[in-house]
Amino acid sequence: ERERRGVLVVVADGMGGSRAGEVASRLAVETVIRVYREGAAGNPLADLYRAVETANQVVHSESVANPEMSGMGTTCTALVVRGGDAYLAHVGDSRAYLMQAGRMRQLTQDHSLVAQLVRDGQLSADQARSDPRRNVVTRSVGVSAHVEIDAQRFEALLREGDTLFMCSDGLHGLVQDEELSDLASEPSLSDGCKRAIV
């Protein structure tokens, strides 16, 4: 089954009052895993896209049905690795990186106000790190009935010794890309992340 479907990894970072963000991220992760496993299309990219799209519907429906959860949402970055190929479906500002031959490359594009301002040349990357609007996400799962999902297949991307690294802005918002690169090179990624945050 693993060879046919690949390995699925999901990062979701919830937003919303009280515990709504936690609920949104949990619902998104559970839904992506369940729908991807069902795999109606038999195509990893199509199944992954459908899984994130369904997660949006589930989170949005719960937000509408439950006043305590009104307006909740979450980022959602879902990655499937099958053979040397990687499949990615992405909404928000959580990130996926590839560490290959000592170089780190961001595979996702942040859906945030400051990232858009950087892309438009209105802010530098250094200015974006301290901009008070850096937490404003322009796309998220569950906030509206429909969401635009970035989906991409990276064919023959992976080689022996490569590392795929995923994180929310809770990590990439605290440490520079160079530090993330060092973390991705650590023998124990979880120990490196703990050291970076503390």
Regions found by a protein language model. Name each.
Residues E1-V198:
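PP2C/PPM-type serine/threonine phosphatase catalytic domain
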